[in-house]
Amino acid sequence: MKATGIVVEYNPFHNGHQLHLNKARELTKADVVIAVMSGSFVQRGEPAILPKWERTKMALAAGVDMVVELPVSFATQHATIFAEESVRILDALHVDALFFGSEHGVSEDFLTAAKTVVEHEASFNQAIQLALIDKKTSYARAYTETFKQSFGTELLDVTKPNNILGFHYALAIQKQNPTISLQTMARIHAGYHDIEANHDQIASATAIRKLLLAGNLEEASRYLPASSIEILKNYDGPFLSWENYWALLKYRLIQAETDELEGIRNVSEGIQNRMQIAATKAQYFSDFIESMKTKRYSNARIQRTALQILLNARNIPSAPYIRILGMNKTGQKYLSHHKKNISLPIVTTVSKAAPGLLEEDLRATNIYTLVKGLENYQAGDFHIPPILKSQT
């Protein structure tokens, strides 16, 4: 069976995702499509708008054959780690191809850039460090500037969010397993960060979340496949944003000793001091973010750091594993065929996992489900089994 991997958040699953999924299967001639999906919290350091099990249902209903959770310690990191660990999981699952959407749309250019960086990695990394020192900027901006100086923007514009992720997928493949085929398609219409829905059928997940958070499911439905609409109508919990967790974060920042926060992942350069001061003054999370923004700290950096503090994520290495969230019969058949040759631990029953392996994800779920209306999902990692979809 030919397998194609995709890296997703489905926050929530919309028409653009359906197009991407269909093209992934068509263009790579895949027999099975495996999605590595963020769990309770997503890459920009935000809570997912829906629990991971509802988003897994959406993925399976739309045609994904297997959904695997990207551990929270990797899912909420910058593009390098996010991509490296996603590729590590897909490689362990023996995928033949990785398919992604990008603003650029030309697979060969991602591979060319990645190969060049791998060949000159030491000098490239040195240039990034110099940019960090000289310009007192964020790591993401330093990386982007170094890339632009090395390649210009004609080869690949890494200021675009999906281009930079795609580049890091290509980089990870070059380092881990160059036999994996990398293929992309150009994103159409809605940009990743567009906050307004302005097309008949395609809108960004950001714009759709804005509609859902405003209670406008009917308007959001224009941009969702029928299967997602049905799942949303049957969902009786709240739609979530950072504001749901602001009181928890504010308490954590106010009560903690400054040196206690130094061992938290992503906490460096005294950012915790600024956060603690900002937390005492901000009424809402949006106020907190605005008061924290500087040239050095992007929104994403602030949110990721805030999330690590909320989750009490210590700055220690995490081990990768394969946590199955859901499968259809094709996915089950594929897993059964390859199970003996998969190098990472496979988790289908959390209670049987090695001690400590899922500790951070279990804590993330427990914190995520503290919000009123999510009582049915509390301790869900233990009582909600992998979702098995029958194929008709």
From Swiss-Prot:
Functional description taken from the UniProt entry: Catalyzes the formation of N(4)-acetylcytidine (ac(4)C) at the wobble position of elongator tRNA(Met), using acetate and ATP as substrates. First activates an acetate ion to form acetyladenylate (Ac-AMP) and then transfers the acetyl group to tRNA to form ac(4)C34.
Biological process per Gene Ontology, one example term: tRNA modification
Ion transport keyword on record: no
Annotated InterPro entries: Rossmann-like_a/b/a_fold, tRNA(Met)_cyd_acetate_ligase
Pfam families membership: HIGH_NTase1
Record bears the keyword NAD: no
Assigned protein family: Belongs to the TmcAL family.
Annotated GO CC locations: cytoplasm
UniProt entry keywords in alphabetical sequence: ATP-binding, Cytoplasm, Ligase, Nucleotide-binding, RNA-binding, tRNA processing, tRNA-binding
Domain of life according to the entry: Bacteria
Record's subcellular location: Cytoplasm
Gene assigned in the entry: tmcAL
Binding-site positions, ATP: 7-20, 101, 162, 187-188
Major subcellular site: cytoplasm
Name recorded for this polypeptide: tRNA(Met) cytidine acetate ligase
Organism the protein comes from: Listeria welshimeri serovar 6b (strain ATCC 35897 / DSM 20650 / CCUG 15529 / CIP 8149 / NCTC 11857 / SLCC 5334 / V8)
GO molecular function: ATP binding; ligase activity, forming carbon-nitrogen bonds; tRNA binding
Documented EC number(s): 6.3.4.-
Catalytically driven reaction(s): cytidine(34) in elongator tRNA(Met) + acetate + ATP = N(4)-acetylcytidine(34) in elongator tRNA(Met) + AMP + diphosphate
